[in-house]
């Protein structure tokens, strides 16, 4: 399949942005990470006065056949139940989105039990969940391509409506297993470095999960190319996020990268086009084992470390005020020359 072209960031604006940041009424570097964040926002949006518009989080939900192998502490029906919770406004991502003025969209990417039409629910379902990759590939290549295309389409719709800052969340029981296999196969790291307790497995459950994933990786040893790995181990929500990352970067949007699952989807996107990373703000490092190692693969320094392990886009929503603050100081803070404040002595 064809993917949108991602334009590398133009560094020509960097000196102007850095000079504007340094001229603010503060000691050089005194706003720390906010300064590098403001610089990145300006480079992504191509202006020394970046304005962040219509912040949005899209939550993609889908079920995983590998849940039937007992790799999660929760049954598969929780995915559909949590989607209903999203639609009722009762989940953590709903609370944080309301708190911070973020638009929230819920997408049925392929929940096992078909969901009734409801206000706020976007139907992009590919199938009634993926197949069990411990036995057979999770998706056909055609399904993976359709999911990526759907994710791209959702992003393009928001871009056309003026959104220029977007994050992606997910809901899918057993999706940490899918993410761990994607991570292991695409990075070559030991599975032990990629696998965690997910929604709260005990020691016996973690051992069972590791055994299932080890067998699955051996079964599908031929899956090596990024799209093959995605189709073999991924979920519909992960594939949609991978497509969404590519479309957002191609649309020159600021991308809020959430937790382990979202970062695994980004790994697929990055293997397809490395330029996608230039548009990404890594919002946090989750408590899920594997996320830190995956962030290290990207050389990423996340904004927050709150031991989150929820997904849903919650880390992206919590980090949004930092981006808003970075843009605000760049646009609104007085300069030494304008305020009549003396600069530091040579």
From Swiss-Prot:
GO terms for biological process: cobalamin biosynthetic process. Pfam families: DBI_PRT (PF02277). InterPro entries: Nict_dMeBzImd_PRibTrfase, Nict_dMeBzImd_PRibTrfase_bact, Nict_dMeBzImd_PRibTrfase_N, Nict_dMeBzImd_PRibTrfase_sf. GO terms for molecular function: nicotinate-nucleotide-dimethylbenzimidazole phosphoribosyltransferase activity. It is an enzyme of class 2 (transferase). Pathway: Nucleoside biosynthesis; alpha-ribazole biosynthesis; alpha-ribazole from 5,6-dimethylbenzimidazole: step 1/2. The active site is at 312 (proton acceptor). It comes from the Bacteria. CDD domains: DMB-PRT_CobT. Keywords: Cobalamin biosynthesis, Glycosyltransferase, Transferase. It catalyses: 5,6-dimethylbenzimidazole + nicotinate beta-D-ribonucleotide = alpha-ribazole 5'-phosphate + nicotinate + H(+). Its EC number is 2.4.2.21. HAMAP family: CobT (MF_00230). Belongs to the CobT family. Catalyzes the synthesis of alpha-ribazole-5'-phosphate from nicotinate mononucleotide (NAMN) and 5,6-dimethylbenzimidazole (DMB). NCBIfam families: cobT_DBIPRT (TIGR03160), PRK00105.1 (NF000996). PANTHER family: NICOTINATE-NUCLEOTIDE--DIMETHYLBENZIMIDAZOLE PHOSPHORIBOSYLTRANSFERASE. This is Nicotinate-nucleotide--dimethylbenzimidazole phosphoribosyltransferase. It comes from Cupriavidus necator (strain ATCC 17699 / DSM 428 / KCTC 22496 / NCIMB 10442 / H16 / Stanier 337). The lineage of its organism: Bacteria, Pseudomonadati, Pseudomonadota, Betaproteobacteria, Burkholderiales.
């Amino acid at each position: 399949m064809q993917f949108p072209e991602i334009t590398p960031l133009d560094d020509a604006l960097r000196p102007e942005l850095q000079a504007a940041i340094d001229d603010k009424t503060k000691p050089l570097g005194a706003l720390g990470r906010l300064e590098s964040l403001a610089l990145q926002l300006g480079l992504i949006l191509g202006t020394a006065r970046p304005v962040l518009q219509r912040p949005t989080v899209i939550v993609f939900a889908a079920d995983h056949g590998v849940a039937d192998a007992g790799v999660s502490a929760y049954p598969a029906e929780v995915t559909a139940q949590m989607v209903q919770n999203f639609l009722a406004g009762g989940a953590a991502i709903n609370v944080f989105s309301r708190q911070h003025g973020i638009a929230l969209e819920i997408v049925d990417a392929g929940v096992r039990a078909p969901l009734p039409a409801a206000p706020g629910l976007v139907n992009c379902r590919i199938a009634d969940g993926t197949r069990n990759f411990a036995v057979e590939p999770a998706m056909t290549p055609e399904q993976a391509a359709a999911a990526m295309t759907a994710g791209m389409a959702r992003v393009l719709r928001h871009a056309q409506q003026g959104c220029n800052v977007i994050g992606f969340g997910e809901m899918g029981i057993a999706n940490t297993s899918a993410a761990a296999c994607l991570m292991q196969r695409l990075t070559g790291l030991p599975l032990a470095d990629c696998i965690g307790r997910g929604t709260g497995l005990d020691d016996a459950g973690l051992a069972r999960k590791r055994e299932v994933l080890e067998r699955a990786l051996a079964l599908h040893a031929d899956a090596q190319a990024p799209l093959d790995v995605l189709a073999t181990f991924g979920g519909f929500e992960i594939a949609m996020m991978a497509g969404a990352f590519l479309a957002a970067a191609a649309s020159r949007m600021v991308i809020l990268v959430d937790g382990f699952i979202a970062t695994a989807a980004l790994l697929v996107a990055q293997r397809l086009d490395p330029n996608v990373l230039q548009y990404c703000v890594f919002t946090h490092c989750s408590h899920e084992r594997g996320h830190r190692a995956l962030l290290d693969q990207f050389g990423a320094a996340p904004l927050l470390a709150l031991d989150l392990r929820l997904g849903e886009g919650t880390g992206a929503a919590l980090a949004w005020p930092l981006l808003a603050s970075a843009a605000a100081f760049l646009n609104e803070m007085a300069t030494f020359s304008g305020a009549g404040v003396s600069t530091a002595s040579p």
